[in-house]
Amino acid sequence: TFEINAMDTFQTFLNACRNGQKSIVKILLERGGIDLNRRDAEGNTALHYACREGYRDLAVLLLEKGADASSANNRGETPLHAAARKGNREILARLLDAGADPDVADREGCTPLMRLVENRRTDAALWLIDSGADTEATDQTGHRALDYATAHGLTEVVARLSQNGSDATDSRDAEGNTPLHQAVYNDQAEVVRTLLAASKAQLDAPNDAGETPLLVACGRGNLHIARMLLDAGADANRPLTNGTTPLHGAAQAGNRFLVEALLGAGAAVDARNGVGETALLVAARAGNNEVVRLLVERHAEVNAANNLQHTALYYAGERGFTEIVELLLAAGAER
């Protein structure tokens, strides 16, 4: 016999669903008196728990017994959102068959597709896209499914969404970042490759801060991605609104090979930023010996002064960078 206090029945039922105990769920349903769509304190129903844990047979049983496929919890999550955690395609299909809206947004504006991508459920995400999910929907911060795929490095999903949405690769988030910006920010080289293959339209597009994807890559010192962007035709001299060029960013990051790649792509060695600094001055002040050495070899103007009339030699001396001081003096820097 299965003795249970009537008051505890609902909690026992929920726990059984949470733990995938289908036989106990069946017994309780046969006894009757269970409200299938009753919510707990967080607003979750039994179906939410079965879907969240990926219990396919249990989810099917609950749906057959009349569970509401569209019930939202306190966070606005439906069973479809819950199913995105494990990404069981059969559960997703059953929920859609039962009338669940594939594009319903939770409190954060996220659709089930976004949650699938966030949980790196590539196969299920591709399936939902093929099932007609809205790929252009945005969450509360202006991000689309493509942005999520970019951030999490799901190249197959990025490729599918780039094919699907005509303007997918041109989309912007709240800070004006394109998917290409986001891939670069997250050091997702394969996603960058996929996006470049889909479209080069946004190659030199600035975000709201004026950064192009190349400027971001150089600021992060990411040589691999910077080379990919340069090979695709990115402008090596496109500056920020304050005059900072990719070369300034690479010099600050201290990546000699990145500086070399930019110079090879036509970056102006003596370009000045808004306060009159050249890349040499930036590198000297940061103590980046190898970058200073390379810039001197490439005939950077060693006596170039910024708006304060300070030179690379001034900053290297002030900060005690002896090797840089010697390099600059040997190249003809004036004390």
Predicted regions and their residues:
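Ankyrin-repeat inter-repeat connecting loop/turn
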Residues: 36, 69, 102, 135, ...
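Ankyrin repeat A-helix N-terminal signature
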Residues: 15-20, 49-55, 82-88, 115-121, ...
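Intrinsically disordered, low-complexity regulatory segments in ankyrin-centric signaling systems
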Residues: 2-30, 41-44, 159, 163, ...
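Ankyrin repeat boundary/linker residues
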Residues: 40, 73, 106, 139, ...
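Solenoidal tandem-repeat scaffolds enriched in leucines and small polar residues
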Residues: 118, 139-152, 164-168, 173-177, ...
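Ankyrin repeat structural motif
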Residues: 21-29, 55-63, 88-96, 121-129, ...
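Leucine-rich solenoid repeat scaffolds
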Residues: 136-150, 154-161, 307-335
